[in-house]
Regions:
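Phosphate-rich cofactor/ligand-interacting catalytic cores and adjacent structured alpha/beta frameworks
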Residues: 165-303, 309-310
Length: 393
């Protein structure tokens, strides 16, 4: 029995990017999704992925959607192909890049990569990396969500088959996202796409953060439920009115087996209790401070209160992609932490700024915060004063 390849997806942090991850999850068992909010972060993210893939024994698939191909990403494409050439037969990784930005074509040509019509896929351009397992496809006429659907055979050769209702909702989602993302104002689906986009931004960071395992399931289920309402004829106003009901129903499902859940609270308050118990959301620094990454300010306030009340930590810090830090504490040490990062505030609520100005992942945030909060002891082995101290004459 041949096991299916592990599939990892890197996608843009917008409606089209999440539409693409929703479609991919409908056809493949995607093991991990990385959402990239800024194109400037794509380079560091793909380099981290390349390091991981170099050490992977079995072949895997990396799916990249709606990211735009800038110079660092194109350099990664070349390094990926070079890595693949050195791997054993049968262990070659697969790279599938689905993009629709005109600027990507210009950048590929500027980096001396041949871009030509794909003879196997009408209407698509393909960049030649001289590797049959590397598919860099560009389609200016369609959004990434539709491309992920139409090119599913590349990342899901034995694709799952959605049920009839799910397939119809998926088609409605694709139509709405494409109308919005390509700004097709004259199409009937545009108004629904705009309402879908508003609901997406109201929900994507305020309930289940991207660093939590529930995140992608929650947002994809929300988009599919909303698409189902649009398919049934709901107006944008009706979708707006019912969005709270959709979110509450999904939260009920997520928390069905959670001990201590209180359904009389708001969805955000209920989720905060569950998130505060999560090991996946935090990294414990060497001084006991718990670090989270990318939580919006309201979520961090609710979750950090629950964490400290439960006795999990006396100090919690949240790092944003833009490099801002928010410290909360119950022992007056939040201000001490913020001062280490050129910040200030109150004794138990303060903020600062990362020395490098930004962070692209929780691991990157930990690497910057740990040595500042908890600097290693100085190495005295090369100091002449240390030698004198130990000399007994």
């Amino acid at each position: 029995m041949i096991l299916p390849m592990i599939v990892t997806q890197i996608t843009h942090h917008d409606l089209d990017g999440y539409g693409a991850s929703t479609v991919a999850a409908a056809f493949a068992d995607v093991s991990r999704v990385v959402h990239v909010a800024r194109y400037s972060d794509v380079g560091p993210v793909v380099e981290d992925e390349l390091k991981r893939l170099r050490g992977a024994v079995a072949a895997e698939t990396l799916l990249m959607t709606d990211l735009g191909l800038e110079e660092p990403t194109i350099a990664f494409l070349r390094r990926f192909a070079a890595m693949n050439r050195g791997r054993a037969e049968g262990a070659h990784h697969r790279l599938v890049v689905l993009d629709h930005h005109a600027s990507s074509i210009d950048q590929l040509k500027r980096q001396n990569l041949e871009v030509a019509p794909d003879p196997e896929r009408a209407g698509l351009l393909r960049a030649d990396l001289s590797d049959p397992e590397v598919f860099v496809l560009i389609d200016e006429a369609h959004c990434a969500t539709r491309m992920t659907h139409d090119q599913r055979a590349l990342y899901a050769p034995e694709a799952k088959v959605p049920g009839e209702t799910a397939a119809a909702d998926l088609a409605a989602l694709i139509e709405s996202v494409e109308a919005l993302d390509l700004w097709k104002k004259g199409e009937p689906a545009f108004a629904g796409g705009l309402a879908l986009d508003e609901m997406f931004w109201d929900s994507v960071s305020t309930l289940v953060p991207a660093s939590h395992p529930w995140h992608d399931r929650f947002i994809s289920d929300l988009l599919m439920a909303a698409a189902g309402l649009l398919r049934a004829g709901a107006t944008p106003a009706e979708l707006e009115r019912r969005s709270g009901e959709l979110r509450a129903r999904l939260v009920d499902g997520l928390l069905a087996d959670e001990t201590g859940d209180d359904p009389t609270l708001t969805a955000r308050q209920r989720l905060a209790r569950a998130l505060a118990r999560s090991d996946a959301l935090f990294h414990r620094l060497s001084d006991g401070t718990l670090l989270s990454f990318g939580l919006d300010s309201g979520t961090f306030q609710r979750v950090s209160d629950q964490v400290m009340e439960a006795g999990r930590a006396k100090r919690v810090v949240n790092v944003q992609r833009a490099g801002t830090l928010s410290f909360r504490s119950i022992d007056g040490t939040a201000l001490d932490g913020a001062r280490a990062f050129r910040g200030g505030g109150h004794r138990d609520a303060a903020g600062g700024k990362l020395p490098q100005g930004s962070a692209h992942s929780r691991e990157d945030a930990v690497a910057q915060v740990e040595p500042v909060l908890n600097p290693p002891p100085p190495d005295l082995s090369g100091s002449p004063f240390a030698a004198l101290k130990n000399w007994k004459g």
